[in-house]
Amino acid sequence: MRAVGVRGGAWLGGVNAWGDVFVDGQERLRWFVAADDRWYRPSRETTVRQREISGVPVVETRIKVPGGDAVQRVYGVADLGGAIVVEIYNDSTLPFAVAFDRGDIATMREPSPTGVQGIDLPAGSVVFPVGHHATMRAALLIGDRERNAGLNAGRKISAQQLESLPSFEQVERGWLAALHVTSRVDVPEASWSNILTTQRCKLLLTGGGGGDSGDRGDDFVALILDRAERVKLGDRPGEWVDEVARAAEQVLQRCAKRGSTSWLDERAILSAGMLLHRAGEVRGQQDVERAWSRLLGSRVAETASARADGEINSVGREAVEKYSGVRQIAWVESQLVAQRHDGVIEICPRGIDAGWRGANFECHRLVASTEHLISFAVRWHGEKPALLWEVEGPAGACVAASAIDREFFSSEMRGETLLAGFTVEQSALVK
């Protein structure tokens, strides 16, 4: 099931593998196509293909029909109190008809007076002709349903109102603009960028916040990562301060009891400090940093000149599929930047994979410390990578790329340099 909806909505839509539309887990609308040769039931067709356009909650489902495809696009809009728009596009050389299994939906024109013929559908089903390269639009009105059983069945909107709703291209651009405020990566491993897009859209679709703060340590980590991502996406940090501070305390206590830290613990503490900093909770931020420093033997407080002694907990090359949700975002970003225990910002802390040699790549606005963001690009000059970087935040940040060039170290907020190359042999990425 692929999710559709609006940012922070009180409802959540979904589209199953063949294009049936759901609202809050209940099936609301099915579609069927009458082509030149026969009726097509999407749930029984072997030619169904589906994708999320640009990775955002705009779901496109295609079915092969004579001369091309019948295309369904489903997405949520906030207009009219909330609606799920269903567009049927005839991407074929022949006309066809589309049927819906309910008639109490908003449509751009009246259904065919002949009704549905040649297929057994529920009473009240409606059918519409769709010409060559034409589009038929319908909508399920959500509105202020107050979680009742009906779906605004008695509410009607005009064809003009339906036509004025945003197109799928506009909704796609809106989602991408919402994501543009946080970190972005353009790297040879394309799935990493897709992960950031998909997981962040899932966050934006839910308004109450995920990350159950139960009794398990992983729940506290997930809560912190969830709230930090929401802040990076534009939420006000103040509303999350208390629960993030409590969750950070639980993570610290667990690490102390266990006598070790994991990379997820480090990302959680970094994220908690970032959120507290953005909320203006300087004392809380400093308390977390001091507690973390004590836990690590005060190595966080070491100066940059002692960078050779800095350490980063290894993520290794575990497949990202081992994780889910916000942990996947943390995994991707930790492959590209990390803060050492001595405070130095490490670019590509696990090195550059051998499979990336010769491929230029860049990353934007990655969280590098509680107070800093970093953007960087790698451009190849023969066998050597040139590094360009820019740090946002207060002066005093130090940058290194020890897994690529052990000699490189800079206290400049922006700059460029030609790195020596690989200091360790990198294996192929686990995808």
Specify the residue positions occupied by each region the protein language model found:
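Terminal accessory carbohydrate-recognition/targeting modules of carbohydrate-active enzymes
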Residues: 1-197, 201, 306-431
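Hydrophobic/aromatic-lined pockets within catalytic cores
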Residues: 146, 229-235, 256, 280, ...
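Substrate-binding groove/exosite segments of carbohydrate-active enzymes
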Residues: 173-295
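Carbohydrate-binding/catalytic loop surfaces
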Residues: 213-214, 249, 258-279, 298, ...
